[in-house]
Amino acid sequence: MKFLPGLLFGALLIAAPVAAAERLPAVLHVHSTLSTGQLSLDELATLAEQGGIGALLLSENYLLRVEYGLPPFRALTRVTYTERSVLASGIDEYLRRVEEVRRRFPRVLVLPGVEVMPYYRWSGSPLRFDMTASDTQKNLLVFGINDPHVLRALPAIGNPYTGRYTWQSVLDAAPAVLIVPGTVLLAVKRRRRQRLGRAVVVVQRRSWFAGAVLCTIGVVALGRAWPFTSEPYPPYENLGLTAHQDLIDAVERAGGVTVWSFPEAQDSGARKVGLVNVSWETAPYADDLLRTFRYTAFGGVYENATRFERPGDGWDRLLREYATNERRVPAWAVGESGFHEFSAGKRFGTLQTVFLVNARSEAAVLDAFRHGRMYALHRTAKEALELGAFTVSAGAATASSGDTLMAPPGTPIEAAVAIDASDGGAHEVRVALVRDGAVVEAWSGVTPFRARHRATFDGRPSFFRVDARGPSPHRLLTNPIFVKP
């Protein structure tokens, strides 16, 4: 339609629910020294407090363990690579440390979360001196679970708390049986006749070498295979997205939230393990978001160039499926930081998820998370775009991000957008209003920006969202508002 000056719809926008809610800037996906980060929890909380950040959503690595074993005795022959993670060092200790930093920094909400690697798979062979571990970064972030018993039992490859007994358990335990004949050889003296000239002497000897070898193999097998449970998600098979969906469902049952992490980022590397070249790789996997269900959100804005959230692409397909009741849970977009340390130009706090809350509490943040009351933000250290309001109205009814507006066919509807700048200044901004995967309005102006779009609801389930951009890297991506008959 057309761009409208700032005060034209001031009364409407101030009355909208978005304006009434408090903006709580948060840094989502942060690692500390408890896992793979380089800053302590206190240092991170200090940065947040100094930067005006209201919440830290920690994503400590849940379990960083990759292993390979030769068949059939995989436990006996396995080689393992591990890095620091909270499951290995103790879930109770992790939650205790978070509680301590909360007491020291009451002005910053610190939410404990984990980054889970649900599954990886091996290809290649050590016999060919070349192996690849795939999908080691196809990860999910988990928040909202503070029960240590539940957190310990998350479905994830390598989790010792979720093992089960299978035929592989029998194979792994089999070499331990060698302790029995080994012990017999060490304990029992064997009689031998030995001729000395014309005389025959009976000599009693134990089989020290053979007995020691058998006992050593048995003891090593016992230690490596104990408690003889097998991996529910063996990395030697292609299980697709089974483990990822199991994790999503387990978290949903526990009342938590899940986030697909960096779906369009690529990760690869290689190192020598003895004579074997071992590489790892994770290709962009945005299409997998269309193949999984019931997760809460995905990383929609981060440092990589992305396509999934573009008009008409994967995100709009997901939203269309939700609007038409093909999905029970919509997929919200978040700003994802992935902060480990200050390196390679990495900054703290420039990628944010801004929650729209009615109270500054962990419960309010998680409630906003589940219901899509937040927007993704890429900013600089000095200034940022701010969502003054984003609403869709039908008569006296008004909905904001994450809401569903009910309206009969033929009802006039109006989408209202307000974009401000954190410093109150006039900054160039381009704003796209997306409806059902297509850009229905594209405006250019300066902050404070106000605009509206009018249409008549035709009765088909619909959704609206806003993508606003300023000079690079400034960007603000809202979550959708649904309209249904």
Placement of each model-derived feature along the sequence:
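Extended, charged catalytic domains and RNA/DNA-binding interfaces, predominantly
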Residues: 20-485
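Bacterial N-terminal signal peptides
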Residues: 5-15
